[in-house]
Structures are given as structure tokens and as C-alpha cells.
UniProtKB/Swiss-Prot annotation:
This is Fructose-1,6-bisphosphatase class 3. Belongs to the FBPase class 3 family. GO terms for biological process: gluconeogenesis. The keyword Manganese applies. The lineage of its organism: Bacteria, Bacillati, Bacillota, Bacilli, Lactobacillales. It catalyses: beta-D-fructose 1,6-bisphosphate + H2O = beta-D-fructose 6-phosphate + phosphate. The gene is fbp. Its EC number is 3.1.3.11.
Length: 640
């Protein structure tokens, strides 16, 4: 490197000895055990279950407690674990159940347990990292308490006096909350969300707010995330799809209450033009209660947005011949006089097909009223401050894929031909396949996000292609049969044929080929979400001799009857990779009052021959590069 670089580097250190100290410090960090990574996918707005799995670290907290307190009964472990998961709620509950003296005893006793737990889970980190994990307000006092928690009788009075003073000042409960937060942070160092935060469940906004406040997180965009990002960034087609899905699952509150998007104009339009239809009956999860009028309105809104979606999609198909979606220009295949449609040479009756604003001569054209409604809604989406913040987070922390610590994370698939070759997508006479295809999509997504004022440019239209396109890594099927499922009785038309990837991913050589295409060796793993694993039918989420792990197991309540479980997560620590299968979450109240936890079953996916160190990770490679530069600076310090 040039002299100027080392001169700038030298300015960061007060002396040659300071450079040596930094070399020693970074070298020591490289020899520490690798921190724990936590993988989640397809959480689909299910905030309570998502939040609980985050808080219990997919069972990691209890595992640490059992190691730290081998003498404890399962009930005692459960009690301390609940305090770590939900400290404020647990303290409030205990305060109501006990008199003041007993509650103070409870706090002091459990504070000691938490101090010992922090000391235990912090063993594999530097003291500096543990210190930074503490809230600044309690940083000094917590360091003192942790150092003295196992003190001899010589220092017992010192330790007790600190606790007594904290108790007298009313700070004991706050310290417990701070310790619980620190334990959770140290138990899991980094979170990967492998796509699909949005749709189906009621609280995707809460999930993103939670992620924004996490110290270390990344996101691999899912198809349901992309369509929301597109709606914010100027795609009227994606926007109609977003509203339609919210209406389908009874989640208009996400739009109206969470994001402040005014739906009044389109709701009034829906009331005027449509009547309820059985195919558009809202799909409500157990426990959601709506009046007959509310259900009817959701039904009509879903029909409205579906027809507008099909009109806008027809326009996109016409202006983007490169997308090769002509077979999905369905409005032009309809015989409106006979109420029939011709698909692949077969003619089908349309059931309860209401299209009061479609002009059979120009089926894709919008009425003047529809154009005004769409323009108004687009403006509402673009000017939602909260949605802007959430999409900004997804842009900053997200990508089409991630190579991290030897593993490849992709939400859906890598499009393949039946022979295992990468399937290419051609745009403007240039073909993209494999990693190049995902890099191209990633670049276009960022172009779209940078120009929300554009509604019909290539980047914005590609966002829709990612939702429905045959070569989309986020979709990976020949067609999305939304129209057929609504209007055609023959279920053979509802089938969405998957890309060959989904059969070929059972083969180790295919996964090795994909890993190599992304610059990873055969010892890595490919982590997917997107397709729910039907465990109750015997489907195995671990495929290709352990090289591929699919972690969509049914966080979305709508899919739990199909999967038989309530989600998979993955843990990757210094000893190897574990897949965790979760049973459904009940409530925070039950967790606090009864100590109920998600029942989780762990399976070992891969065990390392030698314990992984920081130097074996992405972070470690950066540190080793820094050390090499510092060693050059140290050797030639006087020259710079």
C-alpha cells in the first residue's frame, strides 16, 4: 500500500507501543470462540411469536442457564429464563403476588442469578464487548457487581452494600431489566432474517421496529418484502397487490393505523361497484372476529384491488416484452360476452367474475376515477414517514442474498434448468444467470428505491417481475395463478409449477455448484426460506446431505395446519449448526404467569471438527487484514 495510507493509519495511534497493543488486542480477539448467529425466516407479521423466539434465542437462553446452574431444577431454570425473556412483565407480576419484603428478597436473589449468567455468557467475549453491551447508566456498577458476584467473605460486605444501596434508591428492578437485556444480547450476537417479514400476520411494522433497534442484523429480501418496497417506491401494481393481500387476511389496520394510509376513496369505490363473492371471502386466522359488514367490505375491496391489479399488470406486460409474461396477460384472453377465458388452448367458465369497470375493447385501460384513486394512494404510500423509515431499513440492511461466514443465504431459489444449469434472464439483449442474476436484481431494486417518483421505469417494473417472474429468485415458478384461483373452478389451472431448483436442491452436487458460483467452498451451507416445509407429512428441512437447510416452517398461522409446526430457526455457534423446530406460541401473559415457553426440538445439522474461532469468520478476515497493516506500520513506524 502507498505511504499516504500508512501515514493516515499512524495518526490513529499515539506511539509505536500503542500500535503493538492494538496488534496484540486484535490477535487475541481472533482466537476467541465464534459468536452465535441466529437465523429466522418467513415471520409474516407474527410479532408475538417472532419476539418470543428472539427473546429466548431459540432455546439458547435455557441452555446457557442449565450449563451455568446444573444444580437447578427445571422449574427454577424456567423461572429465571422467564425473567430474562420478559424482565419488566415478570417483575410486575411478582410485585403483585408478594409483599414488599418478599419481593425485595426475590429481586436480590435473582439479581445474583443474572449476574452469574452474564459472567457465564460473556466468557467468550472481550471485557470491552461485554462492557459495551451494558446500558451506559449502569456500566460501572455492573462491572463491579459481576467481578464480585463470586467474591470471598473478604468482599461480601462490599458486594452486599452495593445491592443495599441500589435497593434503597429504587434501582434494583431497573438493574435486573438491564441485566436481562444484556444476557439476551450476548447469547445471540447476530440475527439473519432470510426474508418475508410482511403479509398475512398483523404486525410486520412491529417486527421491523424491533429489528431497527437490534445491534447486529441483516435481511435477505423475500418476495413479500419486495412488493411492499415496490409499493412505497412508486409501483401502482405492487401497491394494489399489497392492499389486496391486506384485505384478504383482514389486516387493513397495517395500512390505516400503522402506516397512516388513507383508504377511504378506494373503499367507497369498492362499495359502489362490487358485491361480495365467495372466492374473495377474507381468510381470517383463529381468534380474529369481524362483523358481517366488515367482512363484506374486505371482500369488495379485495375484488376491487384484484381487478385493478390485473389491469395494471396487463399494461406492464405490454411495455416489457423482455419479461416474457405474455401468457399472463389474462384480461385479453377473456370472452366478456360469454364470461369465459381461454388458457393454453382450453376454455373455462369464469365464476362470479365481476368487472364493472372493464372495457372489453380495451380491458387494461383505467377509468378516470381509477386513475385518481391510484394517484391518491401512491402519494399516501410515498409520504408515509413510518413506511419510509421501514423501507429505508430494508434497503440499508437488506440484499438479494448474503454470503456470511461460509454460508449462502437466499430467500427463495436460484433459477435452474432441469439439467442443473443456471437459468438465464435476458433484458436489453444481455443475459444474466446464477450470482450475476441476483446481483443484477439487487442493483435494480436499489435504483427503484432511489427514484420513487418513477412508476413505469425498468427498475420499478422489475420489482413486479421479482414477485411473479419465472426467473425471479424470490418466486421461482412458471406463473402466479392468482386470477385462476379467484375465478376458475378447475383446480388444475391453480397449479404453480416450481422451478427445477426445488427438486434438484436435494442433490449435494447441485448445492456445491451453487456455493462455488458465489465464491464459497463445499463445506458451506445454503440457507433458504420461502417454501413451507410440511414436517407433519415427513418432509425433511435438511437436504443434500446437510448442505441445504430450509427454515420456513410456519411462523404464519395461516400455514401451521399445513406444516404441523410453528416455524424453524437456525443457530450457528462455535460448535456447529443446529436446526430448531418450534411449536406454536401462546401469549406473553401465559409466558410470564405460568412460565410457558415455546417447545423447541433441536437437531444437529453440522458439527465442526475444530471449534470455530473469530478468525474463521467474515469479521475475523477483516481483523486479520487490519493486523497485517498494523504489523507493517509497526515495523516501519519511524518511516511514516
Amino acid at each position: 500500500m502507498d505511504k499516504k495510507y500508512y501515514q493516515l493509519l499512524k495518526k490513529q495511534f499515539s506511539s509505536k507501543e500503542a500500535v503493538l497493543t492494538e496488534i496484540i488486542n486484535l490477535s487475541a480477539i481472533c482466537e476467541l470462540p465464534k459468536a452465535t448467529e441466529h437465523f429466522m425466516s418467513d415471520v409474516h407479521g407474527e410479532y408475538d411469536a417472532f419476539n418470543h423466539v428472539l427473546r429466548n434465542g431459540s432455546g439458547s437462553i435455557k441452555e446457557k442457564l442449565r450449563d451455568c446452574f446444573p444444580q437447578f431444577s427445571s422449574a427454577e431454570i424456567s423461572s429465571v429464563a422467564t425473567l430474562i425473556y420478559y424482565p419488566q412483565e415478570k417483575l410486575d407480576s411478582e410485585c403483585q403476588l408478594q409483599d414488599k419484603k418478599l419481593f425485595e428478597h426475590y429481586c436480590r436473589l435473582n439479581l445474583v442469578y443474572l449476574l452469574k449468567t452474564v459472567k457465564f455468557v460473556g466468557q467468550k467475549y472481550t471485557r470491552s464487548k461485554v462492557r459495551k453491551a451494558f446500558p451506559e447508566k449502569f456500566r460501572y456498577i455492573l462491572e463491579e457487581l459481576i467481578n464480585e458476584v463470586d467474591s470471598t467473605t473478604d468482599k461480601q460486605d462490599y458486594f452486599d452494600s452495593i445491592l443495599s444501596q441500589l435497593q434503597n434508591l429504587g434501582e434494583l428492578t431497573r438493574l435486573i431489566v438491564a441485566l436481562a437485556d444484556t444476557i439476551r444480547r450476548l447469547t445471540v450476537d447476530h440475527l439473519h432474517v432470510v426474508g418475508d417479514i410482511y403479509d398475512r400476520g398483523p404486525y410486520p411494522d412491529k417486527i421491523i421496529d424491533r429489528l431497527i433497534n437490534m445491534p447486529s442484523v441483516d435481511v435477505q429480501w423475500g418476495n413479500h418484502d419486495i412488493v411492499w418496497m415496490a409499493a412505497f417506491s412508486g409501483s401502482p401494481l405492487a401497491m394494489m397487490n399489497v392492499i389486496r393481500i391486506c384485505a384478504r387476511y383482514g389486516n387493513l389496520d397495517i395500512l390505516e393505523e400503522s402506516y397512516g394510509i388513507n383508504l377511504r376513496a378506494i373503499l367507497e369505490y369498492a362499495e359502489r361497484y362490487y358485491e361480495p363473492s365467495e372466492a374473495f371471502r377474507p381468510r381470517l386466522v383463529d381468534g380474529v372476529r369481524l362483523s358481517a359488514d366488515e367482512k363484506a367490505l374486505l371482500n369488495k375491496l379485495q375484488q376491487t384491488t384484484a381487478i385493478l391489479q390485473f389491469k395494471l399488470e396487463s399494461q406492464l406486460i405490454e411495455r416489457r416484452p423482455d419479461f416474457q409474461l405474455e401468457h399472463r396477460d389474462l384480461l385479453h384472453f377473456i370472452d366478456f360476452s360469454q364470461n369465459k377465458i381461454e388458457l393454453a388452448g382450453e376454455t373455462y367458465d369464469l365464476i362470479d367474475f365481476q368487472a364493472p369497470t372493464i372495457n372489453p375493447e380495451q380491458p387494461a385501460s383505467l377509468t378516470e376515477e381509477e386513475e385518481k384513486i391510484i394517484a391518491h394512494l401512491l402519494n399516501n404510500f410515498k409520504t408515509s414517514d413510518k413506511l419510509k423509515r421501514h423501507v429505508g431499513f430494508l434497503q440499508e440492511k437488506g440484499a438479494m442474498y448474503l454470503s456470511y461466514n461460509g454460508n449462502l443465504l437466499i430467500h427463495g431459489c436460484l433459477p435452474l434448468h432441469e439439467n442443473g444449469d443456471f437459468k438465464s434472464f435476458t433484458i436489453d439483449k444481455k443475459a444474466y444467470a446464477g450470482r450475476d442474476l441476483l446481483d443484477f436484481f439487487d442493483s435494480e431494486v436499489r435504483k427503484c428505491l432511489a427514484h420513487p417518483e418513477e412508476s413505469e421505469d425498468l427498475a420499478t417494473d422489475l420489482m413486479w417481475y421479482l414477485w411473479v417472474g419465472e426467473c425471479s429468485s424470490l418466486f421461482g415458478k412458471t406463473a402466479m395463478t392468482t386470477f385462476e384461483r379467484y375465478y376458475i373452478k378447475d383446480k388444475s389451472t391453480h397449479v404453480e409449477k416450481k422451478n427445477p431448483y426445488y427438486q434438484l436442491r436435494e442433490q449435494p452436487k447441485i448445492i456445491t455448484k451453487i456455493l462455488e458460483n458465489f465464491g464459497l467452498d463445499e463445506n458451506g451451507h445454503l440457507v433458504n426460506g420461502h417454501t413451507p416445509i410440511k414436517e407433519k407429512n415427513g418432509e425433511n428441512p435438511i437436504k443434500a446431505d446437510g448442505k441445504l437447510i430450509v427454515i420456513d416452517g410456519g411462523f404464519a398461522k395461516a400455514y401451521q395446519k399445513e406444516t404441523g409446526i410453528a416455524g424453524y430457526t437456525l443457530l450457528y455457534n462455535s460448535f456447529g449448526i443446529q436446526l430448531v423446530a418450534h411449536q406454536p406460541f401462546s401469549t406473553v401473559k401465559a409466558a410470564v404467569e405460568k412460565g410457558t415457553d415455546i417447545i423447541s426440538l433441536k437437531r444437529l445439522v453440522a458439527e465442526v471438527d475444530e471449534r470455530k474461532r473469530v478468525k474463521d469468520t467474515n469479521v475475523g478476515q477483516t481483523l486479520l487484514s487490519e493486523i497485517a497493516d498494523l504489523e507493517v506500520l509497526f515495523e516501519h513506524y519511524e518511516d511514516y
